[in-house]
């Protein structure tokens, strides 16, 4: 379809000869009554009093309307976004420079391919009380625009330094936007073992600021949002993993993700495809909730792909994106605009489908389609609607000013001060609250998978029984000494590989969830790491206990309770050192497959330096310092000291002639170049390695989080 260009504007641009009287019905929301968003006194006794007294500032008046001075108008000008392409696919900066950028919060500077121009000079205004829908064909840049409006540029994307983004005329930073804006992203990321209610409880504890006085209020808010989007029936259903672990349906997952971001009742809300994976009824329910929020004075911006006619009628304004702005205005204005271009929407045709088709690149018609899109964008750029938008954006950006809001900000700069309930670093919850919530969620994940715990313990018992059967009933002679030494080293080998590979995917598997929640300022890196690792600590104490308790008596090791407890203590330390090393590999690896590939070749050198295969005095000088990181070395020495230090001459039988016989425990230790006086040092080094490897894992996780900001 082509555009009629028979007539001309005075400035030479095309003028259409076709007009349209097509009008669209308004939403039934115009007559919908408002309900109080505040928390009513529905509980009894002290809880009821508490809930009745507290009402968050964002709820405004009794009917839920946001006071005029607190409403937000979001404007953006000259948004140009480029796809990043480093020369030859490699960064031009060395690793040390990139690490320095992580510490200084400077972004990497790479060459950009000018052909990858994702968004071109996008200008727009989103007013409070309006529902603005961003539409366009696939790949038009809808999500890219929303990411930039939310200050969440993905890796490989750069926004022009000339871009201006303001709230009520005041330029905002990423930290200020995080405190005032909720962003519902298209991909739903969850901890699959949690139920819907548990997930919302976790979100409420960390998202609802310190101005919310008590936990019962946050839990009451969770009950409210479960009711609002019909999630009550699945409140106790685990979220699961689509196609792998049965749980929530796609629609229920989408509604849960939506409500996670809107728990705090934000004044500015960005939603990327909030209706994807929803049926028509639930899609309308979600948009009705958004429409109701907009009618209370909130600013709502959403992207949507091919909405139905009924959903289209809910939008106050639409923004059509085709690399640049093809149109921004009300549905009424869009009908007139396209009619004047000679391409009116046919009768009984969904306007949203029609506009998206007009702005799409059809196969085998790329040149023709791009010309049509360019003409539409150029026509809109010189239209009165576009001029009004630019004029409005200029006024909001300070040329004219909005008196109502700017008067308030002049005396009390709302946008330059931390939001209520948010500390100076941008976190709503305290350090202890973050730690407690992460610990609670991680512990729930462990408890929700009892089969995994049972399998781990059963596996440990089976391996221990097998080793005990092989080395059963050793006697103190030459062969027995060799067998006992081998079995003790096998303790270390089994504990290492079993625990390294048990945790090697812990952080890699949750990395997308962690990065998203970290960017939303739900918690710090250290609270996440500590809570996650401490929750798994009981399992890594139980496993060595089961293993040692089975093998120790079966092999016939030194029959004294003190020696058994010492062996159990050393094996437990080894289990936690290897677990810490597994955490380090997991945090340093970009994927689970990479972590699994890196693990074995990294562990093997430490195994060789353990003193069993290579005498500690024979380690090459160039590997000497690396051997100091071998937990096998310290644990093997400690176990052998515990086993042989008390054996005197004559206690070990020499049953073979012409064979060297270690007549005492001291001789056995000298064979390995071990010394009794180094026992305390070995224990201290094992503790030091636990701390060192965990600090290394925390540092790697911190680097990963910084690189995504």
From Swiss-Prot:
SMART domains: AAA. Keywords: ATP-binding, Glycoprotein, Membrane, Nucleotide-binding, Pigment, Transmembrane, Transmembrane helix, Transport. Gene3D superfamilies: P-loop containing nucleotide triphosphate hydrolases. GO terms for cellular component: cytoplasmic vesicle membrane; plasma membrane. It is a multi-pass membrane protein. Residues 103-348 form the ABC transporter domain. ATP binds at residues 136-143, 292-299. Its main location: membrane. GO terms for molecular function: ABC-type transporter activity; ATP binding; ATP hydrolysis activity; pigment binding. The chain crosses the membrane at residues 457-475, 487-507, 537-555, 564-585, 598-616, 681-700. Residues 1-35 are annotated as: Disordered. It is found in: Membrane. Residues 15-32 have a biased composition (Polar residues). Glycans are attached at residues 485, 658. Pfam families: ABC2_membrane, ABC2_membrane_7, ABC_tran. May be part of a membrane-spanning permease system necessary for the transport of pigment precursors into pigment cells responsible for eye color. Belongs to the ABC transporter superfamily. ABCG family. Eye pigment precursor importer (TC 3.A.1.204) subfamily. This is Protein white. The gene is W.
